[in-house]
Amino acid sequence: MPLSPPVGRQHLHTRRVTCQGFFREDGLWDIEGRITDEKTYEHANEWRGPLKAGDLVHDMSIRLTLDHKFTIVDVEAVTDKSPYPICGEVAPDFKKLIGLRIGGGFHREVRARLGGVHGCTHIVELLGPVATTAFQTVFSGKARELNRAHRTRMGHEVKADEPAKPRPKPYMIDNCYAWAADGPVVKRWAPDFYTGPDADAVRAAAAGKEIEMPD
């Protein structure tokens, strides 16, 4: 259901965040984020002059390139629009994220490397939805299909007698109400990580079965 009807009000500001995930032909992943801000009225900017309604105050983007372990192997950050001429100077410093793995403690480490005056507030904030987009991309059914096809092309077929590797714990578990480890969603889609009262029976029934996570 949508939000309830609002009281009378005047629209002043719009922030848009767009994130996209891509599987690359070399088997890596590109996760891109863009953030824009605009006002609904004309206002002055000392550096850029008058900004009309709809002119972008901020327009900033970042691309993280990840390997299959969610380790960042390359970063590109750009500032196309900003309120101050020096804002874009910090963009190259986002290379400090190279080597960092998206997972537990990711945001804490981002703040340690790029917090305060060592980074751009808006691009740092953008890394939150970018990280979530990475998981949504890599754990999708289509992504698994593309990854298997790539491995086959590269001669990395899995042999029939090769034991299956245990899958990593899905990031969503215990990070969302619906994905509580003892709840029905985990029981259905990730029974190997289910912790409900009938966990032993559920895990035993799922042993050896490949369960495709929903997109």
Language-model-detected regions and their locations in the chain:
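Active-site- and interface-proximal helix/loop "cap" or "latch" segments in soluble metabolic
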Residues: 14, 21-23, 35-215
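N-terminal "first-domain core" detector
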Residues: 1-35
